[in-house]
Amino acid sequence: LTGKEKNIEADFIFSTVQTISKEDVFKSFNDTHFDEIIIDEVHRAGADSYLRLMDYFKPTFYLGMTASPDRTDSFNIYELFNNNIVYEVRLKEAMENSLLCPFHYFGISDLEVDGKVIDELSEFSNLVSNERVEHIISKINYYGYSGDRVKGLVFCSSKQEAKVLSEEFNARGYNTTSLTGEDSQERREQEIAKLVANNGDMLDYIFTVDIFNEGVDIPEVNQVIMLRPTQSSIVFIQQLGRGLRKSANKDFVVIIDFIANYKNNFLIPVALSGDNSYDKDTVRKFLSQGTRYIPGMSTIHFDEISKQRIYSAIDNVKLNTWLFVTDEYNKLKNKLGRIPTYSDFENYDAIDVRKIFEVAGSYYSFLTKKEKQFKYSGKLTKTAENMLNFVSTNLILSKKI
């Protein structure tokens, strides 16, 4: 279905949500017209347009597909499908099964400008200074790419940074452009076509902020450059994933992450490892031995300054706050559709249950505070609860469950 094509009698109908969510379009079908409905990028299904369609249509079978089911806005996607997870594959498993292109990740230190390390509060002039531009170009040339020519995506921290850096690259002989949410879909497709072309009007790089985090498929990308702070492990993997599609004449993708003095730097090893336990010792170990944990030919390397910046972020971050722990708990609860058991935290690679002990004393105490519907046969006396808290915090915390 498109704005011009309305062949509603076809056996298979493909449509964007923008088109089919229009009332005059979806109501041209009976609510039981479709036997099966497949929704791609289903993590967006919390939007009114998706919910309107799912409320209307009553197919025999709904299938949702997404690379990031755990949304950053806490909407429970799993609940839309009765918590029925047919198949789940994470980065490590995908690499083990050769579903993705091998990658070489380089975490390198971003530049100090006038003796100051770039961070979230850095002045814009420092982000686009000649010194930083030359530093970026030097590193991307050094680490290279696979293929006859570079076809790169550059993720920036703001629209203005993307625009100015693109101009600076062009002034130095590169052919680049910047794309933001303000650009039409037509222009985006035109620029992507130039990026993947092997002759004629070609682009070396597209500078952007977040419009390519999801919903775009450019297998030819052979270099991904990260020039922004890591806000979440979900976004990190989304941006990393832009280069992981297999393509002819691409043996691997190069990921170059410019690591400044960002407070969320600890999320980088968390995202790469896929370890959601948030155990600080585990995160530190991955930082020095990351390549050992990634299957196949992929490699992970951090330079010494980047390591120190990430170690510092690990030391400073508080992973035992009530807000953080309840957020991670809710992710697992949403996936299961019920209150998790002890073993669920390990079986589903969720947060280390010891983090819960640290904030609440014991899992029992946590649930009595967090879950109104939590019922335990024979409520513990205060003395018994205190004893359980003592065992949890003093004995169990001394070793991994």
What are these regions (language model features)?
Residues G147, S158, I268-K400:
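Long, largely alpha-helical accessory region at the distal end of helicase-like NTP-driven motors
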Residues S233-Q238, R242-N276:
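Conserved segment of the helicase C-terminal RecA-like domain
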Residues G3-E36, A47-R52:
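Conserved helix/coil segment N-terminal to the catalytic DExD/H
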Residues D204-P229, V235-Q238, R242, V253-F258:
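A short beta-strand element within the Helicase C-terminal
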Residues I13-T16, T60-A67, Y205-I206:
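Structural recognition of the conserved hydrophobic beta-strand(s) that form the central parallel beta-sheet
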Residues L1-E9, V25, K163-L165, Y174-F212:
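Conserved helicase ATPase core of P-loop NTP-dependent helicases/translocases
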Residues I85-C156:
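Conserved interdomain linker/interface between the two RecA-like ATPase lobes of SF2 helicase motors
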Residues E36, H43-Y105:
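Post-DEXD/H (motif II) to motif III coupling segment of the RecA-like Helicase ATP-binding lobe
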